[in-house]
Curated annotation (Swiss-Prot):
Pathway: Protein modification; protein glycosylation
Recorded GO MF terms: alpha-1,6-mannosylglycoprotein 6-beta-N-acetylglucosaminyltransferase activity; calmodulin binding; hexosyltransferase activity; metal ion binding
Enzyme class: transferase
Protein name per its UniProtKB record: Alpha-1,6-mannosylglycoprotein 6-beta-N-acetylglucosaminyltransferase
Glycosylation sites: N30, N412, N437, N626
Outcome of substituting L116R: Loss of function
Organism the protein comes from: Caenorhabditis elegans
GO biological process: protein N-linked glycosylation
Database matches in InterPro entries: GT18_cat, MGAT5_Glycosyltransferase
EC number: 2.4.1.155
Catalytic reaction list: N(4)-{beta-D-GlcNAc-(1->2)-[beta-D-GlcNAc-(1->4)]-alpha-D-Man-(1->3)-[beta-D-GlcNAc-(1->2)-alpha-D-Man-(1->6)]-beta-D-Man-(1->4)-beta-D-GlcNAc-(1->4)-beta-D-GlcNAc}-L-asparaginyl-[protein] + UDP-N-acetyl-alpha-D-glucosamine = N(4)-{beta-D-GlcNAc-(1->2)-[beta-D-GlcNAc-(1->4)]-alpha-D-Man-(1->3)-[beta-D-GlcNAc-(1->2)-[beta-D-GlcNAc-(1->6)]-alpha-D-Man-(1->6)]-beta-D-Man-(1->4)-beta-D-GlcNAc-(1->4)-beta-D-GlcNAc}-L-asparaginyl-[protein] + UDP + H(+)
One Pfam family per UniProt: Glyco_transf_18
Length: 669
């Protein structure tokens, strides 16, 4: 009997302990699943925010008379171009939505002044008012991104996790180097819509990334998400049309006030790609019209002025096209060229976003002695017609490859792969280990401007960069035939070409003597590990933080507040008839700055510079030139080169830049 009582007691204790525990785990599991499902269903995926309670705002409009509040400095129209019009509107418009009352507007002049100077930034503030807008803080915790992990491909999750230690180190570094750039930044609402993933069923790009497919886009999106999270902005991420619709509806249903209780109500920036832009245009036209200036388009190869509007391209498509295509499927968006954010800093008209070079796990102490090369080409088609250069390479070094679609048991395998150690598809960690033991990273001429050469350089390998006998462009190369740019590729990677020795040797790989000499030279160089600052976590954090804070494309900005600062502008005229503004600026060790074009597009300036008695106007990517000013803001162009027969001299605005950080001028900090 006692034994039975003991058993019952033990059973009771056991159940009393286990049942709540089981219920706890069941609840957590379900809550986690419910959060994930509701997050996707109702909001899209957002960063997990640790928000503080709203600040209690105390305002006293009796400190100033109504006449004092309506009195503005004499230079108000210069320093605050929209202030007086906004004051005129709000006197009648403040009753149109309750959010104005929530921001302490009561119909008095002082409440109008308070709102337009402290809540918004349209007017000069009254002296006693303190700033109250939410600020972004460096947040190097991966926890903020965990809800977003539900929606992104495996490769992106793996990369963000793998590099998170580097992101934290980068955050510390940038705060040490550039503290003034990283504090007092507005906390922005940022929508990230990865358009090509919304078309994943057709493209299978995420699926292919795990089996040797192209990684450039996924890599850049991964680094952008990490950057935006670390620099402290609020993210809304969508990878499909359903979550995009819910996010759009949420913001469209909010009132007109930018802030309520110190919390930002409106979207500030929308990152997407060309496929995503087309989805917005097709399904959310009104939203796009309202937020067009907030779009930032990830555009790897960049876009030139000739392709940004459909009208100009159609009128000139014969001269802008080669034998392969006369179409412009990736252009015609009508955006400011600075809204196109690129993979490399190759186009002064566009904005450089970039990516981060993976240096996780690099063995800097590894002094490998046996000369070896890894061929840059992870699919068989990239090796086509490369037998001669590969044979030269085999004669001198051990050759490795990572061709994912190569079956060594196939009886029809090309002879080019004989005596090549193929490792097949490797993940990031395995690639890193292989690069630690490689002397030469050997380019075959394609892919153009991928991330791999920078990673090889980070491991201390010399990149042999394939030089082209004739520069490649949309006019003569099928791969580029529909890209919205007239850029000319002189080699596989022009950015690496500029870096040069000891890290890069650019050579015609089909010239046997020159190639053999280059290979032997590469073996002897033994360069140190090197990553340009703009491709480090600290460099990307610094660049993106400044661009989001300073690059203004929506509102009228006073000259004194423009960025880059106007006092950094240097004006030159082109020397040769076919020079672009990039050509003349680069020859002075400067960059062409597109934001300065409206300033120099002035009849008095042209008359003074070119000794003109009068000026005309023209919608041309070469204007302003000679005695002609630019008629279309869409056609201002740093990159456009006029035909020699035009016999014109362009007027060009240039600026300096921080070494290894092209996007930022020396006084832009």
């Amino acid at each position: 009997m006692r034994r039975r009582h003991r058993c019952v007691a033990l059973l009771f204790i056991f159940s009393a302990f286990i049942t709540p525990l089981g219920f706890f785990y069941y609840t957590i599991s379900n809550e986690s699943k419910r959060y994930s499902e509701e997050s996707e269903k109702n909001y899209g995926y957002q960063t997990l925010e640790f928000t503080e309670s709203p600040e209690e705002i105390s305002v006293d409009f009796d400190k100033y008379s109504q006449s004092e509040c309506s009195r503005f400095p004499s230079n108000v129209e210069i320093e605050y171009p929209e202030c007086l019009n906004k004051m005129k509107w709000i006197k009648n418009g403040w009753k149109t939505h309750h959010c104005y009352i929530e921001n302490h507007i009561d119909g008095s002049e002082c409440s109008f002044r308070y709102y337009l100077s402290q809540v918004e930034n349209y007017c000069p503030p009254m002296e006693h008012h303190g700033k109250r807008k939410g600020l972004a803080k460096i947040s190097p915790s991966i926890r903020r991104l965990l809800p977003i992990f539900e929606s992104i491909p495996h490769y992106m999750k793996t990369r963000i996790n793998r590099l998170w230690k580097k992101w934290k180190e980068g955050a510390h570094e940038v705060m040490q180097k550039y503290p003034k750039s990283m504090i007092e930044r507005r906390k922005l609402n940022v929508l990230v819509f990865i358009g090509f993933l919304a078309n994943e069923q057709k493209l299978n790009m995420a699926k292919k990334s795990d089996h040797g497919g192209p990684l450039g886009e996924l890599l850049q999106w991964s680094d952008l998400l990490a950057t935006l999270s670390v620099i402290g902005h609020h993210l809304e991420v969508s990878t499909n049309k359903n979550t995009l619709r819910n996010i759009v509806w949420k913001y469209m249903s909010r009132g007109p006030c930018q802030y309520v209780n110190n919390f930002r109500q409106q979207l500030d920036i929308i990152f997407t790609d060309i496929m995503g832009f087309n989805i917005l245009r097709q399904h959310h036209r009104q939203f796009l019209l309202s937020n067009r200036c907030r779009i930032r388009l990830l555009d790897s190869f960049g876009t030139h002025a000739e392709f940004t509007t459909k009208t100009y391209f159609v009128q000139n498509k014969k001269s802008l096209s080669g034998p392969f295509s006369q179409r412009n499927p990736w252009g015609g968006h009508g955006l400011d060229l600075r809204q196109h954010w690129t993979f490399y800093p190759h186009s002064d008209d566009n904005t450089f976003l970039g990516f981060v070079v993976d240096t996780e796990g690099i063995d800097k102490k590894n002094n490998q002695m046996i000369p070896s090369a890894l061929v840059y080409g992870k699919e068989q088609y990239m090796w086509r017609d490369a037998e001669k250069p590969i044979d030269v390479l085999k004669r001198i070094v051990t050759v490795h490859s990572t061709v994912a679609d190569l079956d060594l048991k196939d009886s029809n395998i090309s002879s080019i792969f004989k005596k090549v150690q193929n490792h097949g598809f490797l993940n990031s960690e395995e690639i890193s280990q292989l690069l630690d033991n490689i002397t030469i990273f050997f380019g075959l001429g394609f892919p153009l401007e991928g991330p791999a050469p920078l990673e090889a350089m980070a491991h201390g390998a010399v990149f042999i960069n394939a030089k082209f006998k004739e520069p490649k462009s949309r006019l003569n190369y099928k791969f580029l035939a529909e890209k919205p740019t007239l850029r000319k590729w002189t080699s596989q990677n022009p950015y690496m070409e500029k870096i040069g020795e000891p890290h890069v040797i650019t050579v015609d790989i089909f010239n046997e003597l020159e190639l053999e000499e280059a290979i032997k030279r590469a073996i002897s160089l033994k360069p140190k590990h090197f990553v340009p600052f703009e491709f480090t976590p600290a460099g990307m954090l610094h660049r993106v933080a400044l661009l989001l804070e300073k690059q203004e494309l929506c509102d009228k900005i006073a000259y004194s507040k423009r960025w880059p600062p106007i006092d950094q502008m240097k004006i030159f005229r082109t020397l040769n008839a076919d020079d672009s503004c990039e050509t003349i600026c680069h020859s002075k060790q400067l960059l062409c700055e597109p934001s300065y074009f409206p300033i120099i597009n002035s009849s008095p300036l042209l008359r003074r510079e070119n000794l003109c008695s009068s000026t005309t106007s023209d919608s041309s990517p070469f204007a302003p030139f000679n005695c002609t000013i630019q008629q279309s803001a869409f056609l201002f162009s740093c990159a456009s080169s006029p035909p020699i027969s035009f016999e014109i001299n362009r007027l060009c605005p240039c600026r300096d830049y921080i070494p290894e950080q092209h996007a930022i001028c020396k006084k832009c900090l």
